[in-house]
Amino acid sequence: MTENIASLFASTITRLSPAKLNLFLHITGKRADGYHNLQTVFRLLDWGDYLHFSVSNDAVISTIASELTSNQFCHQLLILDGAEAITTSIEDNLIFKAARALLAFAIQSNTLPEQLAKVHITLDKHLPMGAGLGGGSSNAATTILVLNEIWQLNFTCDELIKIGATVGADVPIFIFGQDAIAMGIGEELTTIELPDQQYLVLTPNAHVNTAKLFAHPKLQRDVAPLSVATIKNQYADYVQTLTPPYHNVFTPVVTNLAPAVADALSYLQGLEAQTLGTARVTGSGSAVFLPLDASVATNEKLVAKWIADAPCTAYIVGNLK
């Protein structure tokens, strides 16, 4: 490692790993590869997990004439910490998978630097697992972005999005790093400008397996596709309220399978008249949210009552700026 790199990364790098909301979520068809084509608008939040990357200034691995695989490199280069960071098998961990995918791309493209520094990654977990907030995917994306800097791989955003898509369908949006219209399996991203917004987010203690939801016979998979231009022009139909054809196809399925999600959504629906917004599910659940009109978002006493009365853990969060 050169002196300037050692100096640049002598201290720990801390990054927000943000949550996301799906303002609507449509499935427009099933692909030949078994995945589903979708259309959604991702809204990134100023709330999430934090990842801390501590880089060793002297512990490096030489890549010269090395025959190590990306998997073997990861086992030598990474130390993962944090109660939620370690899974039964480290190779099933999304942070590990993200680093492995990044190194695999570097090996394939013959762009590995001569040395790679060892990195200690600590996950400070705040987002609940399996909530439709993108926590694990966001952790993976943050890992890809920061390790690309630390190891000076110099991959472009488009290349990193391609790498992220091999890790998970929601990873690309967090590499993209801004609100976007998403199509395909989530990797076809187009920037969209949205007004600043506050949200009341509820995270019921429920989790329904995503594969089970996608396989459910009552899941709608044939929503008529909309053009990017239409979605941009009709943003008023899904930003605050939710007007047909905009909806989340998972809502009837997940609320049927998970009563706690139904209860949380019902609670928010009871606040719609006061907030001038439409309550909805994000992703495939279990989290639900309600956009708040600016006139009520600043009413601290009222908002505190909503949080206190909620049937589960509740948060007030804003969009990422």
What is each PLM-predicted segment?
Residues I61, L68-T88, T143, A165, ...:
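Short, basic/glycine-rich phosphate-binding loops at helix/coil junctions
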Residues F174-F176, I181-T278, V303-A304, I316-K321:
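Conserved, helical-rich catalytic subdomain that frames metal- and/or nucleotide-binding sites
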Residues S62-S66, T156-F174, V303-K321:
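Short, conserved aromatic-histidine micro-motifs
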Residues T2-M129, E149, L153-D158, T203:
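ATP-binding N-lobe of GHMP and related small-molecule kinases
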Residues A117, A140, I144-I181:
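Contiguous, small/hydrophobic- and glycine-enriched helical/loop subdomains that border
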Residues T122-W151, T278-L292:
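Glycine/serine-rich anion-binding loops at beta->alpha junctions
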Residues M1-L16, D293-K321:
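Conserved glycine-rich phosphate/nucleotide-binding loop
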